Structure formats: C-alpha cells, structure tokens
Curated annotation (Swiss-Prot):
Family per similarity comment: Belongs to the SUI1 family.
Organism: Arabidopsis thaliana
Modification sites for N-acetylserine: 2
Annotated protein name in UniProt: Protein translation factor SUI1 homolog 1
Source superkingdom: Eukaryota
NCBIfam families named in the record: SUI1_MOF2 (TIGR01160)
Region spans: Disordered: 1-24
Annotated Gene Ontology cellular component terms: cytosol
Biological role stated in the UniProt entry: Probably involved in translation.
Gene Ontology biological-process entries: regulation of translation
GO molecular function: mRNA binding; translation initiation factor activity
UniProtKB keywords: Acetylation, Protein biosynthesis, Translation regulation
Length: 113
C-alpha cells in the first residue's frame, strides 16, 4: 500500500524540459517549436533556442513572408528571445529552419497537441 501512496499525479509543465538543459558539456542545443492554444480555433506557435548570433528579426521577416502570417520577437527573462507566429506553423517552421541551414533536423523538438 505504501507504493500506491507515493505515486501522486503532478501537473505537466511544457516548458520544463527547456529549463532543465541550461548548461553542460554534453548537452545539445535544441530548438523547441511549440503551439499554444488561444481562444477558439486560434493558436500561437513559439520558436525558442536559436543561436544568439542569428538576427531574430531577419528570421522573423522571412517566416512571416513565407507563411503569410503575423509574428513578433518577445524578450523573456528566463528563455531569452522567443519568436511568436500566429497559427499552427510547427511543421512549416521546422522545414524552413532545416532548408535554410540554421538548424539540423536532429536538433529540433516539436511540442504540442
């Protein structure tokens, strides 16, 4: 009975894995692409983990032009700069980043639904 008592369900945090890999010698630099549900059928795609030497505004400009959506770059205290795009653009963003040569396909993690 004591084994069953110790299994307490906890809340799921979608950003927990991003915070867990702050630094280390053997850690990979992953790019996390997430989708967040807004109101109704509206959704928001976030891209985080790109290298700091890249120009986020130029990447955002190309993404907006390619996918015909609106977006912005948000400065977060914990996560750094995060690109936000309107709509569910997870697959589009991942293929764009790989084709542009910014990220290898193995270093992309797609989260959501």
């Amino acid at each position: 009975m004591s084994e069953l008592d110790s299994q307490v369900p906890t809340a799921f945090d979608p950003f927990a894995d991003a915070n867990a890999e702050d630094s280390g010698a053997g850690t990979k630099e992953y790019v996390h692409i997430r989708v967040q549900q807004r109101n109704g059928r509206k959704s928001l795609t976030t891209v985080q983990g790109l290298k700091k030497e890249y120009s986020y505004t130029k990447i955002l400009k190309d993404l907006k032009k390619e996918f015909c959506c609106n977006g912005t770059v948000v400065q977060d205290s914990e996560l750094g700069q995060v690109i936000q795009l309107q709509g569910d653009q997870r697959k589009n963003v991942s293929t764009f980043l790989v084709q542009a040569g910014l990220v290898k396909k193995d270093n992309i993690k797609i989260h959501g639904f």
